[in-house]
Amino acid sequence: MLLLGLLLLTSALAGQRTGTRAESNLSSKLQLSSDKEQNGVQDPRHERVVTISGNGSIHSPKFPHTYPRNTVLVWRLVAVDENVRIQLTFDERFGLEDPEDDLCKYDFVEVEEPSDGSVLGRWCGSGTVPGKQTSKGNHIRIRFVSDEYFPSEPGFCIHYSIIMPQVTETTSPSVLPPSALSLDLLNNAVTAFSTVEELIRFLEPDRWQIDLDSLYKPTWPLLGKAFLYGKKSKAVNLNLLKEEVKLYSCTPRNFSVSIREELKRTDTIFWPGCLLVKRCGGNCACCLHNCNECQCVPRKVTKKYHEVLQLRPKIGVKGLHKSLTDVALEHHEECDCVCRGNTEG
């Protein structure tokens, strides 16, 4: 009987010690979880929403010391003003577990654009400090992950700030009326407009609709237009590599030119002021001629007519005469490599 009593007493004491140890372990885990959630959200399916109206910062746990293992923290910064953006600046003290094969697989911090779910960047290691990141709207998401191995220090700290929206000018490109501008200044002002309607509104604010309607009425003689499209020759037996060289070496390609400069006209304004033309361009590395240096020159040149809006000062009175007109510009249809300077043979 005495032996049975001793066995029961020993079992009870052992159970008490086991329960105390389990309670202690549970308490430690709860304390660790509380520490993690103090600066973010541990569950990756949830996030801590941080409402901001000014500058501030978030950081890895225990920054600038070694961060804990097995951590997932998610923050979503939301600015109070819906019209602002958020800029993130990383502290120079940055260090996470090094990447493997140039990939941040284990410990990393990443920034996500919530509007479309795109990841702006993922960073780890300690080689370079990540650059500034800016949200598209008034919120941005940050996620920090560490695995169960090799925690590093100092972790990271991200400073956030508010970027106010830029004030857009609703006035015309020039504060002076068109009649008070010189032709060169007026040309610069005209260039800033995107559509004919905006341009006519600027030139004739009181009667712009009438001028715009009359602009397209066929009240003037229609000029002939010679839009010449040369046929591109194709060599059927050329090696593919040589064909690629021909395509990307000395060939006609798109260039934008100023109409006033091309026509050498300083007495009038054209809109649009620039047009695309075909001009010879590229290099002549494989020049077939026996010379020290080759240059790419046009071999066949044609004139093409482009219909544009012409603005000419009225004689004797203020204002501009507006009309649609054709301008002839040179287009290079074929190009060739020739010797620059003196040739030999």
Swiss-Prot record:
Residue intervals of the CUB domain: 46-163
Biased composition (Basic and acidic residues): 34-45
Main localization, broad class: cytoplasm
InterPro entries recorded: CUB_dom (IPR000859), Cystine-knot_cytokine (IPR029034), PDGF/VEGF_dom (IPR000072), Sperma_CUB_dom_sf (IPR035914)
Compartment list: Cytoplasm, Cytosol; Secreted; Nucleus; Cytoplasmic granule
Function as written in the Swiss-Prot or TrEMBL entry: Growth factor that plays an essential role in the regulation of embryonic development, cell proliferation, cell migration, survival and chemotaxis. Potent mitogen and chemoattractant for cells of mesenchymal origin. Required for normal skeleton formation during embryonic development, especially for normal development of the craniofacial skeleton and for normal development of the palate. Required for normal skin morphogenesis during embryonic development. Plays an important role in wound healing, where it appears to be involved in three stages: inflammation, proliferation and remodeling.
Name of the protein in its database record: Platelet-derived growth factor C
Provenance organism: Rattus norvegicus (Rat)
Encoding gene, per UniProt annotation: Pdgfc
